């Protein structure tokens, strides 16, 4: 299992880490490297962005005038989701200089993140997970193509997979020439969300939706928050095209820098769907799952595509139970199947994977479907629709139809994704 790194420990100098885009000067960093998530000497800097003020400056100009001669390495420049840069500094003196710089609005540690995935388990089919949320009934809306764009910010997507409509690709991982998936995780998410309805393979929740392969994780499934923000910066550059973004990744940590980038993406009109995490803990300690503006998704085990708990049991719990690994808590908005999910994989293949990573693209596909039918819907409209149309605790199973799941670990009882035709319309 690929897990998040380390135990969260941070010394904040302000209380609110869910920062707004109009932020006062904030310093959220710990220069003492006893947190495994923190990347030593690596920081995310946001600059003042009021063009009418004298303390506004271009990020590259700022680096050249303030940092280049100090031996600081420039990693990324951000222009769209925020104005800022990611840097690697030679020593603590540079950090102290930045704290007193009038151009600087925010300083935060860069951190390691990872894909929320478990170990793989091995004519076209409708996966049981799609059946469980009644996704197969939606094929009559548009059997060949869903008019929406889904960005997968992950390990990339198999660019040549015959079952996927990869519309655009971009990699932010050094040493790669494109966003072709060298791990498999991102391709799996893409198939769950949007595999084509054709004569082979599988069918996704939003068949044939345009996929944006945004590679922000390495072949190991690991990455850095600064790289993820660069991916968010890129989709914000294309905010008039991208409808939904999937972030099935994170760490057990806080990141004000990532919160700001996500909140600005949502304000730009992009619905952000994230995985709750795979540690069996309260998701409130995980980033980006704990951001109140995103749609956070937990995972259930479902083995027969039906309610009632009559399917075979799994290593992660009985059929129709909250998966044993799934994070939970009041930050979770909705649940979806996430155990032994059969989907597309790298090298034009298919496999089963397990994790809240697999649950999130079910919800992202549903969000894309809703946007295709309601183009003017805001991210908040989409989130509200998915939550209010979901299956609730009071929806009992009749033995074969759709009903709630069991084994919720808290008293919040997030709804189970449901997207039957009568709901989506």
Please identify what each model-predicted range represents:
Residues 138-169, 177-227, 240-243, 254, ...:
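Subtilisin-like serine protease catalytic core
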Residues 76, 203-209, 213, 232-234, ...:
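C-terminal subdomain of the subtilisin-like protease fold in secreted/lumenal serine endopeptidases
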Residues 154, 164, 270, 286-372, ...:
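Extracellular S/T/G-rich loop segment that most often corresponds to the catalytic His/Ser-adjacent loop
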Residues 9-23:
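Sec-dependent signal peptide cleavage junction
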Residues 43-45, 84-86, 106-108, 149-153, ...:
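Structural recognition of the beta-strand scaffold that forms the well-ordered cores
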Residues 23-40, 89-96, 118-152, 170-182, ...:
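N-terminal domain-start motif of subtilase-like serine proteases
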Residues 176-190, 281, 351-363:
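Gly/Ser-rich catalytic serine loop of serine hydrolases
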Residues 22-34, 64-126:
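Autoinhibitory propeptides
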């Amino acid at each position: 299992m690929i897990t998040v790194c380390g135990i969260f420990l941070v010394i904040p100098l302000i209380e609110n880490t869910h920062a707004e885009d109009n932020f006062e000067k904030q310093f959220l960093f710990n220069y003492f490297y006893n947190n495994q998530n923190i990347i030593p000497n690596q920081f995310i800097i946001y600059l003042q962005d009021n063009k009418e003020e004298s303390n506004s400056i271009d990020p590259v100009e700022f680096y050249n005038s303030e940092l280049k001669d100090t031996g600081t390495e420039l990693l990324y420049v951000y222009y769209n989701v925020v104005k800022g840069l990611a840097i690697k500094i030679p020593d603590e003196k540079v950090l102290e200089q930045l704290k007193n710089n009038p151009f600087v609005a925010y300083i935060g540690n860069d951190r390691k993140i990872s894909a929320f995935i478990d170990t793989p388990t091995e004519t076209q089919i409708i996966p049981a997970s799609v059946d469980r949320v009644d996704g197969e009934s939606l094929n009559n809306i548009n059997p060949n193509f869903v008019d929406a764009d889904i960005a997968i910010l992950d390990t990339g997507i198999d660019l040549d997979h015959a079952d996927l409509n990869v519309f655009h690709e971009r990699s932010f991982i050094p040493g790669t020439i494109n966003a072709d998936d060298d791990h498999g995780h991102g391709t799996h998410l893409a198939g769950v969300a949007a595999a084509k309805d054709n004569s082979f393979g599988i069918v996704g929740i939003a068949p044939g939706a345009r996929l944006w392969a945004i590679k922000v994780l390495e072949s190991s499934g690991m990455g850095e928050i600064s790289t993820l923000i660069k991916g968010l910066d890129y989709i914000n550059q294309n905010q008039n095209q991208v409808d939904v973004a999937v972030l099935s990744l994170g760490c057990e940590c806080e990141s004000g820098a990532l919160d700001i980038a996500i909140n600005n993406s949502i304000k730009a009109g992009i619905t952000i769907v994230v995985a709750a995490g795979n540690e069996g803990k309260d998701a409130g300690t995980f980033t980006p799952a704990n951001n109140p503006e995103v749609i956070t998704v937990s995972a259930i085990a479902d083995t027969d595509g039906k309610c009632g708990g009559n399917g075979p049991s799994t290593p992660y719990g009985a059929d129709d139970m909250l998966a044993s690994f799934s994070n939970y808590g009041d930050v979770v908005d909705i649940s979806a199947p996430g155990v032994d999910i059969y989907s597309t994989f790298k090298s034009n293949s298919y496999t089963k994977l397990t994790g809240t990573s697999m649950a999130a693209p079910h919800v992202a596909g549903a969000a894309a479907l809703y946007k295709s039918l309601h183009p003017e819907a805001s991210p908040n409209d989409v989130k509200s629709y998915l939550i209010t149309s979901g299956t609730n605790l009071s929806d009992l199973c009749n033995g074969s139809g759709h009903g709630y799941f069991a084994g919720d670990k808290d008293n919040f009882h997030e709804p189970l994704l449901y997207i039957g035709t009568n709901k989506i319309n």
